[in-house]
Structure formats: structure tokens, C-alpha cells
Amino acid sequence: MAAKIIDGKTIAQQVRLEVAEKVKARVAAGKRAPGLAVVLVGANPASQIYVGSKRKACEEVGFVSRSYDLPETTSEAELLALIDELNADAAIDGILVQLPLPAGIDNVKVLERIAPDKDVDGFHPYNVGRLCQRAPRLRPCTPRGIVTLLERYNIDTYGLNAVVIGASNIVGRPMSMELLLAGCTTTVTHRFTKNLRQHVENADLLIVAVGKPGFIPGEWIKEGAIVIDVGINRLENGKVVGDVVFEEAAKRASYITPVPGGVGPMTVATLIQNTLQACVEYHDGEEA
């Protein structure tokens, strides 16, 4: 069986067009365009690329995009003061602080300082807690983007054995909550998991997010499984690959996401969706 490719690039483009239409309709009705503030501290090259793609996506859909590029020497107090300022700014619906932050700045403190109704990354404990309690508002971008992919391909997740590999706060943990909401029997594996292969072989839906190229061999994949590869790994030869050995896995899976062009574009598309949602659900009616 050759797997059907889940085309994240195309779905992400659809999502962006849908958001752009809604923004156009808002502006035509005399409402303001949603605003996103993107904060980058230091000059991490990978972060600069991510931030660039987020800003570009914002402008494409007609958002107001505000950039704050702070020097590596920025103190925690200065960053927290900027967040306070943005929390109070009625023209801003979403605040995104690009991780990782330089040494000496406490990630947790920074993420918790963002007002939950402007936390378009979905990392604030309030938003994670809402997801845990089955009443999500702003949802973490990568997991929500994956759910959107499954929905757009009309994949029925109810009753599937879902296995998440990797238990990070950004993907693995919130993903497990999304899968419970989607009716899956969900297992999360991590570095202490014994007999990983057995878990993978049992997965009807496999989501891999560990950041290690070729970490999951193709022969472990159950026949007919749905494989979602979150990994983005650049090899020394410049090639970008996922956490799953794609060629082998694609022979066994029913659906698979490629790398690049699978989950990656959905993360940014979901950020855009979240910003519009924050604007409409939380901030409409406030004077900008």
C-alpha cells in the first residue's frame, strides 16, 4: 500500500485564505484588522527564520503585524515590561515571544506574563488547563494544526489507538489532550518508555515529535496507520528530514505527512487562526 500524502502546505494555504476573507469582511464592516506582536530576543538564526515566516503570514492575511527585535542583552525585567505594555494595548490581539530565550531569562515567567486572552501560542497555563478540561479556547498551534489536518482529510479518529512520541510542553503533552478530545485511546511515550517499538506497532495514529532524524524505522509502522511527523531536522548535507524514515513508512501507512510540507506550515496557519479568534472572541467591542 502506498500512503496518501497529507499535504500540509495546501491545507495551510486554505486556512490562510479563509482567515484573509474574514479579515477583509471585518474591515469592510468598519472593524479593525487583528493585530499580532512578535517579539524576538537575540539573533538565533533559526528563530529569525521562524519569526520571518510568521510576520509574512500576518501581512498576507491583512493583520497588523508589529515586530520587536530586542538585543541579546535584554534583561528579563525589560522583556516583562514590554509584555505588560502589549497586554494593555487594545490594537494587539496576540503576543508571540519566540523561544528559546537567551540564558538568564526565565521562559516560564515570560510565558505566564502574557495575558491568556492574547496567548496565541496557547502555552499559558490557563489555556493548557482549558484544553485539559475539555473547554479549549486558544489552543497550542502545532497540536491544533495537526487536528485540522486530520479533519480536512476526513479522518475519523474516534476509537483509534493513538501514540504520541515525545512529551514536550509544546507538542507532545497538548497533543495528547487534543487526541483525547478527538476520541482516541491515547498513549504518550518519552525517554523512559520501555519497548518503544511495541507501542509504535500498536498505533493506528502515530504522532512523532522528538527532533531526531529517522528516529522511527519504517518497518515499525502498523499496516494502514496514519503517520504524522512533527520533526524538522536539517542533515549535514542540507537536506531536511523528519523523525520517521519516510520512504519505508510510506509503504505501510495509509496516510503520512511529508517533511518539509506537512506539519510545519500548519503551525503558522494555526497561529493566524488563533490571532483572529482572540480578536473576535475576546477583544471585539474594545476600542482600538
From Swiss-Prot:
Return the Pfam families for the record. Answer: THF_DHG_CYH, THF_DHG_CYH_C
Sites where the protein binds NADP(+): 166-168, 232
- One GO term of the biological process aspect: methionine biosynthetic process
Disulphide connectivity of cysteines = none
Q: Does the keyword S-adenosyl-L-methionine apply?
A: no
- Record's GO cellular component terms: cytosol
* Enzyme Commission code(s) on record: 1.5.1.5, 3.5.4.9
Q: Its annotated pathway?
A: One-carbon metabolism; tetrahydrofolate interconversion
Where does the UniProt annotation place the signal sequence?
none
Reaction(s) catalysed by this chain's protein: (6R)-5,10-methylene-5,6,7,8-tetrahydrofolate + NADP(+) = (6R)-5,10-methenyltetrahydrofolate + NADPH; (6R)-5,10-methenyltetrahydrofolate + H2O = (6R)-10-formyltetrahydrofolate + H(+)
Q: What does this protein do?
A: Catalyzes the oxidation of 5,10-methylenetetrahydrofolate to 5,10-methenyltetrahydrofolate and then the hydrolysis of 5,10-methenyltetrahydrofolate to 10-formyltetrahydrofolate.
- NCBIfam families noted in UniProt: PRK10792.1, PRK14186.1
Name the protein family.
Answer: Belongs to the tetrahydrofolate dehydrogenase/cyclohydrolase family.
Quote the subunit structure annotation. Homodimer.
What is the protein named?
A: Bifunctional protein FolD
